């Protein structure tokens, strides 16, 4: 019966194109493919490559899809569109395995989606610039080199900067280069839940065996194990066993290992033993190139240069925020037939701009601190260690971390090329002093008020 329904999809699509118009249909529904029809439930399942597209199609065209299908097949009760990796769940039946372990097939040219990976998150689609070149190059080496000189690889950045993209890219390239390898890609939260479930279910041996069978373990968002002592202990043993066996480990987190308060020292030592690569906030050039790369894959969509420049100017904190704004603009234009221009962007993305507006810059913080303590601006970058200069400099570093999205290495560079560990020390020192020294706490509060005024 599924085959009969599949044969109807071209007719359904033709009717939708006629009803919705060629432009809207071609942009949203042309990439959709028939997946399945269950005669028992009356549910038609369609597939598209993007979760974003799937969500929009379900929300905006769900009723139209059901009506179009019922005109061809009256038994249809509902239509569902799924996107991303869900589109290949038929070929990668992983539900029976508690941990998402992916065994690459023998064919070197296997489709990454069939392994449970998102083929869009590849190295080819990761735009490289100064802010992320260390992390990108290290990730490529981890995926391809027979014996990487650094292991584990620790990627850290704020949210939406591309850490998960690099994890997926590593997994896909490693699977292509090592067809018989076992790859595990999971979040630290998933590791914790699986560990707790194995303990309660008396299945620890199977849990340990699955993890230790990995040739490549990729662990996302390590900060989720902060304060989870038993999970950290098991993770430490897992890492030790993998490293001893010559296996590869890649970890991501939202901060450097030294700032993971609540994580056991031995685990931090293991994670710091390879390479710690920071991804900084994206510069203007990188943000523009990301937009143009996205648009190059959509030749039917026209976005003027002044709109691209406006997006680059107003969405500076992270890539996810930028792509979200672009998606919203493209979706509105596709669904309403509106022409994309600067006026439309300013109107439809006004709320996004308000939430994305950069709070304060490091330059502004340095100026405010120097004004408060009557220092010269050069003191922020100087090597002078006298207390009258060193303490205000620490306060400025602390405020830079509190009030901007900049990473520790980036802040250090803005303070005379100081190492990220110096910035970490400054932040911790000022945090402690604010509790113990009410006068300093009041001074910092006054500086913050001046910055917000």
Curated annotation (Swiss-Prot):
Residues 116-333 are annotated as: Domain III, AAA+ region. ATP binds at residues 160, 162-164. Residues 76-115 are annotated as: Domain II. GO terms for molecular function: ATP binding; ATP hydrolysis activity; DNA replication origin binding; lipid binding. Residues 1-76 are annotated as: Domain I, interacts with DnaA modulators. Oligomerizes as a right-handed, spiral filament on DNA at oriC. PANTHER family: CHROMOSOMAL REPLICATION INITIATOR PROTEIN DNAA (PTHR30050:SF2). This is Chromosomal replication initiator protein DnaA. It comes from Sphingopyxis alaskensis (strain DSM 13593 / LMG 18877 / RB2256).
